[in-house]
Amino acid sequence: MLSYSTGRRKCAVAQLRFFSGNGKIVVNGCSLDYYFQHNSAFTKIIRSPLKLLNLELLYDFIIVVKGGGLSGQAGAIRLAIARVLAGLSPSNRSSLKSKRYLTRDSRIKERKKYGLKKARKAPQFSKR
């Protein structure tokens, strides 16, 4: 194992182990395509830091991801991969930072307030 990293997005937390290998990505014991239901949008999000640095076929990743939905999990995995690749060399870090792959997206679900139907949706107002 070369390195370890963690990424978070919405309610999802991804823990990543990083090995030298041939580009295999395993998520929760399944292949990347199978876990994300062959959805190319999610796999594109996850592979984008690797594609940017042309490192797609050099490293293997074993990822355990919990919480959230598929979109949040894909974002968490992308952040974890970007953090691990940024630690390899300073030039990687600058190119990943320019594309904002190292920025933690802090937007989370707003809590529901009492007296309201949802976080901001109020019941219909009647004057009379």
UniProtKB/Swiss-Prot annotation:
- What keywords does the record list, in alphabetical order? Chloroplast, Plastid, Ribonucleoprotein, Ribosomal protein
Superkingdom, natural source: Eukaryota
Basic residues composition-biased segments:
109-128
Which residues lie in coiled coils? none
The record's listing under SUPFAM superfamilies reads:
Ribosomal protein S5 domain 2-like (SSF54211)
Q: Which GO terms describe its molecular function?
A: RNA binding; structural constituent of ribosome
Q: Name one GO cellular component term.
A: chloroplast
User: Is the Repeat keyword given for this protein?
Assistant: no
Q: What is its main location?
A: plastid
Q: Which GO terms describe its biological process?
A: translation
Where is the protein situated, by its record's location annotation? Plastid, Chloroplast
Q: Where is this region: Disordered?
A: 106-128
Family note:
Belongs to the universal ribosomal protein uS9 family.
What protein is this chain from? Small ribosomal subunit protein uS9c
Organism expressing this protein natively: Cyanidium caldarium
In the UniProt record, the gene name given for this protein reads rps9
